[in-house]
């Protein structure tokens, strides 16, 4: 507490519940409170794979175990604290990453695409709010812009759905499809998708009627399984899949786009490409009745995103609208003096395209009837 002039010795066996043979993997001082610190230890060299993770709130005088939610056979390696929200902690373990929203009182497994691997180190890139993971022999992983996690608490996880604040979306024209002429020396990872990244949380899965029936039949494995009936099976075949829907609107409340993904429990994300559907045209000459959709760039400004779910054909609102900005990536250039005129012309062209599509479809149906 005096800049390193004086030290107080503390041995491992002074920590409650920690064997004296345990090895100290990490010690972290709290970024916001000088009396709070965290320590991670392991004793696997002696056949002990328990997680030893402790916290002090009085400068090391007393330590308390904070392993609620971490399985008994999970070694802990590193801990990092968010630099904005003091309650948000990340923990690297032998079997992936865990996250806490209340300073370690409770931990949650945080996989979301991360394989079950040994994560040995963690670092936070503060400028971009990225979480960087180093694994044991399985490369590096980066969680891009985790700032949405700062808005989560244990109580908010009980909500049916949450849509998080998107960051400002920068608008530009991508010119290359992600690769170049590097031949055999081409090694790369995917960049974040172009557009507005929208993250959302869904509390529960909603299983289809077929999935529920199959679960019941599994429980009847040792007995005769009743036949559900042809009508019930037909209804299962035509039942619409459960979906999460993010509706994009402009500030006038006009629907600009709808982003649809399968409804899944936990943290999810969808990417809006900052474009608006131009219109659809039914190709009447095609046996497949192909529907072609064009999309054009939206103008910069304020937009809103709102989360819905569709379960067995019924749509329910899960969140209030959340606003975000769309801006040009280059701000030191001249603006288009005809932007409003271009927008009005595009809207007129969209209406004309829609009318043309409807006319073409009506003509196609009439011609089929005459045949």
Briefly describe each language-model feature range.
Residues 1-186, 193-194, 203-205:
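Beta-propeller blade termini and top-face loops
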């Amino acid at each position: 507490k005096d800049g390193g002039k004086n030290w107080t010795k503390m041995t491992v066996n002074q920590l409650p519940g920690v064997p004296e043979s345990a090895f100290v993997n990490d010690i972290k001082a709290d970024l916001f409170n000088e009396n709070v610190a965290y320590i991670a230890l392991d004793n696997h060299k002696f056949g002990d794979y328990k997680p030893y993770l402790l916290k002090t709130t009085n400068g090391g005088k007393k330590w308390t175990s904070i392993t609620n939610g971490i399985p008994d056979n999970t070694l802990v390696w590193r801990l990092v604290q968010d630099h904005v929200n003091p309650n948000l902690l990340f923990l690297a373990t032998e079997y992936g990453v865990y996250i806490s929203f209340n300073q370690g009182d409770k931990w949650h497994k945080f996989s979301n695409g991360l394989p079950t691997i040994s994560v040995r180190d963690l670092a936070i890139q503060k400028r971009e709010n990225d979480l960087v993971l180093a694994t044991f022999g399985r490369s590096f992983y980066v969680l891009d812009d985790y700032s949405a996690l700062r808005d989560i608490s244990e109580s908010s996880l009980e909500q049916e759905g949450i849509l998080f604040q998107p960051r400002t979306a920068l608008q530009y024209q991508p010119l290359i499809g992600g690769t170049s002429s590097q031949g055999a020396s081409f090694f790369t990872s995917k960049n974040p998708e172009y557009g507005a990244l929208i993250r959302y949380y869904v509390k529960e899965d909603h299983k289809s009627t077929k999935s529920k029936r199959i679960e019941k039949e599994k429980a009847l494995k040792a007995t005769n399984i009743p036949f559900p009936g042809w009508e019930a099976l037909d209804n299962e075949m035509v039942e619409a899949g459960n979906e999460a829907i993010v509706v994009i609107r402009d500030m006038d409340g006009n629907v600009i786009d709808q982003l649809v993904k399968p409804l899944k429990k936990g943290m999810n994300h969808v990417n809006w490409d900052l474009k608006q559907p131009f219109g659809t045209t039914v190709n009447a000459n095609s046996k497949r009745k192909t529907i072609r959709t064009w999309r054009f760039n939206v103008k910069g400004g304020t937009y809103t995103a709102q989360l819905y779910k569709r379960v067995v054909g019924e749509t329910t609102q899960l969140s209030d609208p959340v606003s975000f900005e769309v801006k040009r990536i280059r701000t030191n250039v001249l603006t288009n003096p005809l932007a409003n005129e271009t927008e009005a012309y595009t809207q007129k062209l969209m209406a004309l395209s829609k009318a043309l599509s409807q006319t073409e479809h009506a003509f196609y149906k009439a011609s089929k009837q005459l045949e």
